[in-house]
């Protein structure tokens, strides 16, 4: 009789040896570094099946081990839960006795925090709109650029679990060594203005009996109840974790020394602007203690040529963890193409012929560095546009069968299409990579948090230029299942494109 909890067989596929080795390891801390498209979620499902299979074979007379699986967004949490239940509920002998809710919880960090403090909410509601929306409504005269800047800084301070007083002290110290007097007064004035606005925001929350997401996590850290003691904690997309989320999980471990199983890809750490901290995955062992480390390097998403090109590109940043990703040996003519014209308009007009000759029912992503890059494509008269929640849906009258979407590089993460076209690959301030100057105060917030967590500071020289932009470009490249196109303008090519031209996998087509 077939074992329905066979962890080597997940969702109709046999797992590879690297996946199985990581699953069978049962040490206190496990870090699985998995490349794009290598089957991170199937590995997590396999791990849960392994835990239940082990329990069933050894200790079926006691309740199953309590498992917490954490994902980062509501959509990914729902998908993960559905996929886990679809696999484990096949074993009807186990679930005649136990209900999955008795031993497995699938949460986001916020839903977990909400569960922890549920009894202490005392009628408070969750303020989902947050600080930025508060500023837009209460400060209509404040320029939008300033609102975004304050909202970003506030988000970093909260997610990095740093106090603005500490930032002020570091600003004073930095002034003595590096800054001009005007830099000092400008940065101190910004923090003082932020403190006033935050005070007003906190009054607004109190008046409306509300709590925001960061407050939820902070309160949960202090109110952990023994009913939240777990035997296993599994974290998906670990590279996206913030210091505040890390501290919540660390506090949970004080209740019971659970076994930790984390799956992530440092090459795809692209949410630093929202509080993700790459040193938490690069210095994992320093955070959690002795760790068993595994790699999953066989991708099921894209062909070998694209794997080779993208891997060489990302590993030019020497701080990234080394991986040798292997792809499918699929031959498609011109898998990696640069379209180089004398102007952006020429490049975009050429899309008409590319779209016209694409296979039937192909899926296509147009990826920009910024959301506003859609304005460039909107000049194409042969395309029509329809806004949806996460992306812009595009249609072409002559090819209604094509499924075309525009997304920013950040929003493309986790998604894939047959054909990907990266637009705006130009060497400009708002090109790709972005040359927007890094904010000194943002960097100081990170610095304080890293020191407090006992982390080793990342050496910027070893990262090379544009380290986060490089990871973002890598994410955009690896959305393609079949072919990737880069749209460039002659004599204004992105430095990333100049790098890629050195590789034999890239074919450049020059337009007149």
Language model: regions and residue ranges:
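ATP-hydrolysis module of ASCE/P-loop NTPase motor domains
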Residues: 100-101, 120-196
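Structural recognition of the conserved hydrophobic beta-strand(s) that form the central parallel beta-sheet
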Residues: 69, 106, 259-265, 406
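Conserved helicase C-terminal RecA-like lobe
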Residues: 360-363, 412-490, 498
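P-loop NTPase Walker
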Residues: 1-122, 478-479
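Conserved RecA-like helicase ATPase core segment
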Residues: 11, 49-50, 246-336
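Conserved two-lobed SF2 helicase motor
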Residues: 105-111, 212-220, 401-411
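Conserved helicase NTPase motor core
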Residues: 3-39, 187-280, 298, 414
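Helicase P-loop NTPase motor core
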Residues: 31, 38-44, 290-292, 298-398, ...
